[in-house]
């Protein structure tokens, strides 16, 4: 069950204040200590060396940054997942347009790996080949599902330079069209999209990207949210332990 609405709105207000203070302090530090801030950002950026400092650092603490971070933090207030708990059986849509649910992809006691993300999230694409190798190595003992959610860095939102150019999805067809771009990368597992109500993204607190392992309807592994804590290698460790 989610939070009662009055409690949810009070927490949203508190988060709003926290994010506003974070952005204000960030702007001050960026103004007073630009070299130190750049050093910190470059160190973080080492986790995705194919996406340079100049592509995204100038957008830090912008109004678009503020709204995106606020959206992510508000979404996490409605997280309905916990290790060992029941996995939300949210509706999703196949690329054919057929509607189904997440649990439809579970088979007996085989683990089901959920990979939430979008093409405009650099870390999701940067680690896509790593995720594909995971599928190839464990396809005989586990199932995999990519759930395409709202864009992390839409071109009309908190956009980065030299990134994939996709606007905010206004319709389900927009989302399906964006998800089909992943097919060029030949994913060896089904790809579905979140509904326009963003229920799976909301209940799994998946924005901007996140990994889960389900088994028999329950959450076996809950990865931390990306971009910095999105680690397919942790899923590998979980699957290896299951079948050791």
Swiss-Prot record:
It holds the Pfam family T4_deiodinase. Its EC number is 1.21.99.3, 1.21.99.4. Keywords: Cell membrane, Endoplasmic reticulum, Membrane, Oxidoreductase, Selenocysteine, Thyroid hormones biosynthesis, Transmembrane, Transmembrane helix. Residues 1-12 are extracellular. It is a single-pass type III membrane protein. One of its GO terms (biological process) is thyroid hormone catabolic process. PROSITE patterns: T4_DEIODINASE (PS01205). InterPro entries: Iodothyronine_deiodinase (IPR000643), Iodothyronine_deiodinase_AS (IPR008261), Iodothyronine_deiodinase_I/III (IPR027252), Thioredoxin-like_sf (IPR036249). GO terms for cellular component: basolateral plasma membrane; endoplasmic reticulum membrane. The active site is at residue 121. It is found in: Cell membrane; Endoplasmic reticulum membrane; Basolateral cell membrane. It catalyses: 3,3',5-triiodo-L-thyronine + iodide + A + H(+) = L-thyroxine + AH2; 3,3',5'-triiodo-L-thyronine + iodide + A + H(+) = L-thyroxine + AH2; 3,3'-diiodo-L-thyronine + iodide + A + H(+) = 3,3',5'-triiodo-L-thyronine + AH2; 3,3'-diiodo-L-thyronine + iodide + A + H(+) = 3,3',5-triiodo-L-thyronine + AH2. GO terms for molecular function: thyroxine 5'-deiodinase activity; thyroxine 5-deiodinase activity. Residues 34-244 are cytoplasmic. The keyword tRNA-binding does not apply. The chain crosses the membrane at residues 13-33. Belongs to the iodothyronine deiodinase family. PANTHER family: IODOTHYRONINE DEIODINASE, TYPE I IODOTHYRONINE DEIODINASE. Plays a crucial role in the metabolism of thyroid hormones (TH) and has specific roles in TH activation and inactivation by deiodination. Catalyzes the deiodination of L-thyroxine (T4) to 3,5,3'-triiodothyronine (T3) and 3',5'-diiodothyronine (3',5'-T2) to 3'-monoiodothyronine (3'-T1) via outer-ring deiodination (ORD). Catalyzes the deiodination of T4 to 3,3',5'-triiodothyronine (rT3), T3 to 3,3'-diiodothyronine (3,3'-T2), 3,5-diiodothyronine (3,5-T2) to 3-monoiodothyronine (3-T1) and 3,3'-T2 to 3-T1 via IRD. Catalyzes the deiodination of rT3 to 3,3'-T2 via ORD. Predominantly monomer. Can form homodimers but homodimerization is not essential for enzyme activity. This is Type I iodothyronine deiodinase. It comes from Canis lupus familiaris (Dog). The lineage of its organism: Eukaryota, Metazoa, Chordata, Craniata, Vertebrata. The gene is DIO1.
């Amino acid at each position: 069950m989610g939070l009662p609405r009055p409690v949810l709105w009070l927490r949203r207000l508190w988060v709003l204040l926290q994010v506003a203070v974070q952005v204000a302090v960030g702007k001050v530090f960026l103004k007073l200590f630009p070299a130190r801030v750049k050093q910190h950002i470059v160190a973080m950026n080492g986790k995705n060396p194919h996406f340079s400092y100049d592509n995204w650092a100038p957008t830090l603490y912008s109004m678009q940054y503020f709204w995106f971070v606020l959206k992510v933090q508000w979404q996490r207030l409605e997280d309905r997942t916990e290790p060992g708990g029941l996995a939300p059986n949210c509706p999703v849509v196949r690329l054919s347009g057929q509607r189904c649910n997440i649990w439809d992809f579970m088979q007996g006691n085989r683990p089901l790996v959920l990979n939430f993300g979008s093409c405009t999230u650099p870390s999701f694409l940067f680690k896509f080949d790593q995720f594909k190798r995971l599928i190839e190595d464990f396809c005989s003992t586990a199932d995999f599902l990519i759930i395409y959610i709202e864009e992390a860095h839409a071109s009309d939102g908190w956009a980065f330079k030299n990134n994939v150019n996709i606007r905010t999805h206004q319709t389900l067809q927009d989302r399906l069209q964006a998800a089909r771009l992943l097919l060029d990368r030949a994913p060896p597992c089904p790809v579905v999209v979140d509904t326009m109500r963003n229920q799976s993204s909301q209940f799994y607190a998946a924005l901007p990207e996140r990994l889960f392992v389900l088994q028999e309807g329950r959450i076996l592994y809950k990865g931390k949210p990306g971009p910095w804590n999105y680690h397919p290698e942790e899923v590998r460790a979980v699957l290896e332990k299951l079948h050791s």
